């Protein structure tokens, strides 16, 4: 056992070999390296698999009761100051290491085929391997200085991969947005680290926790306001990294990178880094009640905000991005209420489910690109999808499992962890628990909206006369899945027929004069005629992805089905302590858990949350499944036609407000644009004007004045007698005038 811990230092550095070898190959033998580029996927997967095996062995030892292991190497800078580097192995480290390596391996296998035709294939694998190295270094760090070093490396790799296709202006702007937003959090993190060093005189976690809790909390040796400020600055770094409100704005734009990296960022690396930091520092935060309240409040706001912003997105990856934001809010909420176990449990289950969904979306995008084009505005647009079930059955099945898991449907993984968070929230605040519970219904709604628009009904991209441009009225499917051609009725629950049209559309909600989209009106009667023209473009259909892309989906689907078993807690009378609780025992000794093991209460609370989730699924099925399926009658929808005109208008107004809020990202980006970006640019222009007119004016004025003064003196002393006589007579005249 001791030998295993002694060699744990290799964990971060093994994947680094791939980056170094690719770099040396491109430097020394570039032609040969590029010719055999597909071979580099094998060592990348192999080396990360070695780390996974090693991490699994460490995890087994932790579960079997091993203590925390730390190794430090001191680097003396002066006689009074030294930095220590090393590694820390504890339950949190082993959990994160397994998460990073398992998800990372699946993403690398998937990427081999997904990126095979990209010119940046080698660069992609070099970045990915370095990304894994940086994240593994972060989770094994024993102190704040080492954390900060790898924290910056994780951010750098994220920026490189978000802007991987840097020749596209949108990707370059997304990279800059992620960089600038995270700079705010990283600056706060650095100030917080320096502040706690000033308080405790140490960067080491163990020393930091002991000194702070014993000497400061108990003896009141430091100003509590200053300690709270430093803790908030540390938390600010996690807010930016994990895309929590209000520094979440970079996350949807980060979808401009390749889809495999989106899966890795959202499941196990970039956004998980902020959660890891809060979990690592929780023994410190838990002694500062104000910070715990702030953490839980920020988490709750993010839960609700992310869910509402996902409601009306058309881009499949951006919908998943807002879903990630909301689910990370659940984890942050759990950490804020002191439910350490539930937070890590949901981090695990969400990672596998979200990786499955992102890789599934990549499979969908990969199959749609030959049909609609390679622009993300089209290939990622759910408006152009539909009916993919018969073309991509394996992708559909795995995506469906991931969707059910994220909706919190038992017995899939996320059900157990999410409901444990909601259950523990009741102990902290009924208001928080109620909001978290009802947000589960929103999650179920937008996830099934995504699933139904993508897989159910008919393939909409092959309809003749279809335009994929955003200014096309056909394009504008709203939150409720219908045409958006009129400003008042653009967001109706379902498009309805024109009164001049004698035919009837039985499942429309309102019988009024709003014009139905032609593709919906003719869907059942003349669907096949849309595919009868001879244009070869319209004869294209999606196809199932290759085996190397399907294999990771199937493995992640298995994880999604069964990984929840590690944390199922029935209570001592029914079953022994679950695996996750045994795993976390050394870490949980440092914390006061705010959780309950009452199985009856868990089932009762789970019944409410699952019922709300099923209600969200039902509403999504009503609003989306009825339009794009072959069902002829849906009496619930038809009942809306009986409402009076005032009620319909009021309902439309409410829907418009919800749609506009969601589609426009809650107007937060607009606010930042007007207040911060334009404000900073205005200040920059003012500073530039002041510099040009005042600073440069004074400097240039002195130079010009010196020039003319020199020219004048040169002219006077130029050796001309007439000038001397004129100057002499002028001086004599002045003297005579003064004398008189």
From Swiss-Prot:
Q: Which chemical reaction does it catalyze?
A: a plastoquinone + NADH + (n+1) H(+)(in) = a plastoquinol + NAD(+) + n H(+)(out); a plastoquinone + NADPH + (n+1) H(+)(in) = a plastoquinol + NADP(+) + n H(+)(out)
What keywords were assigned to this record?
Chloroplast, Membrane, NAD, NADP, Plastid, Plastoquinone, Quinone, Thylakoid, Translocase, Transmembrane, Transmembrane helix, Transport
Q: For this protein, what is any one GO molecular function term?
A: quinone binding
Q: How does the protein associate with the membrane?
A: Multi-pass membrane protein
What are its GO biological-process terms?
ATP synthesis coupled electron transport; electron transport coupled proton transport
Top class in the EC scheme: translocase
Recorded hits in InterPro entries, A to Z, give: NADH_UbQ_OxRdtase_chlpt_su5_C, NADHpl_OxRdtase_5_subgr, ND/Mrp_TM, NU5C-like, Proton_antipo_N
* Short name of any one Pfam family annotated for the protein: Proton_antipo_N
The EC number(s) given in the record are: 7.1.1.-
A cellular-component GO term for this protein: chloroplast thylakoid membrane
Task: State where the protein is found.
Answer: Plastid, Chloroplast thylakoid membrane
Principal localization reads plastid
Tell me where the transmembrane regions lie: 9-29, 39-59, 89-109, 125-145, 147-167, 185-205, 231-251, 259-279, 281-301, 328-348, 355-375, 397-417, 426-446, 548-568, 607-627, 719-739
Quaternary assembly: NDH is composed of at least 16 different subunits, 5 of which are encoded in the nucleus.
Recorded family membership: Belongs to the complex I subunit 5 family.
Function text = NDH shuttles electrons from NAD(P)H:plastoquinone, via FMN and iron-sulfur (Fe-S) centers, to quinones in the photosynthetic chain and possibly in a chloroplast respiratory chain. The immediate electron acceptor for the enzyme in this species is believed to be plastoquinone. Couples the redox reaction to proton translocation, and thus conserves the redox energy in a proton gradient.
Q: Which NCBIfam families match?
A: NDH_I_L (TIGR01974), PRK06590.1 (NF005141)
Protein name, UniProt field: NAD(P)H-quinone oxidoreductase subunit 5, chloroplastic
Please spell out the taxonomic lineage of the organism that makes this protein. Answer: Eukaryota, Viridiplantae, Streptophyta, Embryophyta, Tracheophyta
């Amino acid at each position: 056992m001791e030998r295993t811990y002694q060699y744990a230092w290799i964990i971060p550095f093994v994947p680094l070999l791939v980056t170094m070898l690719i770099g040396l190959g491109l430097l020394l033998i570039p032609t040969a390296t590029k010719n055999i580029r597909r071979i580099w996927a094998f060592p990348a997967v192999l080396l990360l698999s070695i780390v996974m095996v090693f991490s699994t062995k460490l995890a087994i030892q932790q579960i079997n009761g091993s203590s925390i292991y730390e190794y430090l190497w001191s680097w003396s800078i002066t006689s009074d100051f030294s930095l220590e580097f090393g590694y820390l192995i504890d339950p949190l480290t082993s959990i994160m290491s397994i998460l990073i390596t398992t998800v990372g391996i699946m993403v690398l296998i998937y990427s081999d085929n997904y990126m095979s035709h990209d010119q940046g294939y080698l660069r992609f694998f070099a970045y990915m391997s370095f990304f894994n190295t940086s994240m593994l270094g972060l989770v094994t760090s024993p102190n704040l200085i080492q954390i900060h070093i790898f924290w910056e490396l994780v951010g750098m790799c994220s920026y490189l991969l978000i802007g991987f296709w840097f020749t596209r202006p949108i990707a370059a702007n997304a990279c800059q947005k992620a960089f600038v937003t995270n700079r705010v959090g990283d600056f706060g993190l650095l100030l917080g680290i320096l502040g706690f060093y000033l308080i405790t005189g140490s960067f080491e976690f163990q020393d930091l926790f002991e000194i702070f809790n014993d000497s400061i909390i108990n003896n009141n040796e430091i100003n509590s306001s200053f300690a709270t400020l430093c803790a908030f600055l540390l938390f600010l770094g996690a807010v930016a990294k994990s895309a929590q409100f209000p520094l979440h704005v970079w996350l949807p734009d980060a979808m401009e990178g390749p889809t495999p990296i989106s899966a890795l960022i959202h499941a196990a690396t970039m956004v998980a880094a902020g959660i890891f930091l809060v979990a690592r520092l929780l023994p410190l935060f838990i002694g500062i009640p104000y910070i715990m309240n702030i953490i839980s409040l920020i988490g709750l706001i993010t839960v609700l905000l992310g869910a509402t912003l996902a409601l009306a997105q058309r881009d499949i990856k951006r919908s998943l991005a807002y879903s990630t934001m909301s689910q990370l809010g659940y984890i942050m909420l759990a950490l804020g209420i002191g439910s350490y176990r539930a937070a890590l449990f949901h981090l695990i289950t969400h990672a596998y489910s979200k990786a499955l969904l992102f890789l599934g979306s990549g499979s969908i995008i990969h199959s749609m690109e030959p049909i609609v084009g390679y622009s993300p505005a089209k290939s990622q647009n759910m408006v152009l999808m539909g009916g993919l079930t018969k073309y991509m059955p394996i992708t559909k099945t795995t995506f469906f499992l991931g969707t059910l898991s994220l909706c919190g449907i038992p017995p899939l993984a996320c059900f157990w962890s999410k409901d444990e968070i909601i259950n523990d929230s009741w102990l902290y605040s009924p208001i928080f628990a109620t909001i978290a519970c009802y947000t589960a219904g929103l999650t179920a709604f937008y996830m099934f909206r995504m699933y139904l628009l993508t897989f159910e009904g008919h393939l909409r991209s092959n309809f003749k006369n279809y335009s994929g441009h955003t200014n096309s009225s056909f394009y504008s499917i709203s939150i409720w899945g219908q045409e958006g051609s009129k400003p008042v009725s653009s967001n109706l629950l379902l498009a309805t027929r024109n009164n001049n049209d004698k035919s009837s559309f039985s499942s429309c909600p309102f019988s009024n004069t709003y014009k139905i989209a032609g593709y919906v009106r003719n869907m059942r009667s003349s669907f096949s005629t849309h595919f009868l023209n001879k244009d070869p473009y319209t004869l294209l259909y999606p196809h199932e992805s290759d085996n190397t892309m399907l294999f990771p989906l199937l493995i992640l689907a298995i994880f999604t089905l069964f990984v929840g078993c590690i944390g199922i807690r029935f209570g001592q009378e029914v079953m022994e302590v679950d695996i996750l609780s045994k795993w976390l025992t050394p870490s949980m000794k440092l914390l006061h858990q705010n959780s309950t093991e009452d199985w009856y209460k868990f089932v009762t609370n789970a019944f409410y949350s699952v019922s709300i989730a099923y209600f969200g699924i039902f509403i999504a099925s009503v609003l989306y499944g009825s339009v794009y399926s072959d069902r002829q009658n849906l009496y619930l929808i038809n009942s809306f036609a009986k409402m009076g005109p005032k009620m319909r208008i009021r309902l439309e107004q409410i829907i418009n407000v919800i749609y506009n809020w969601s589609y426009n990202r809650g107007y937060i980006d607009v606010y930042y644009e007007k207040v911060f970006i334009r404000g900073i640019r205005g200040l920059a222009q003012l500073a530039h004007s002041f510099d040009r007119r005042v600073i440069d004016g004074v400097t240039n004025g002195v130079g010009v004045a010196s020039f003319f003064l020199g020219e004048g003196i040169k002219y006077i002393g130029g050796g001309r007698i007439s000038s001397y006589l004129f100057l002499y007579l002028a001086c004599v005249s002045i003297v005579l005038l003064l004398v008189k």
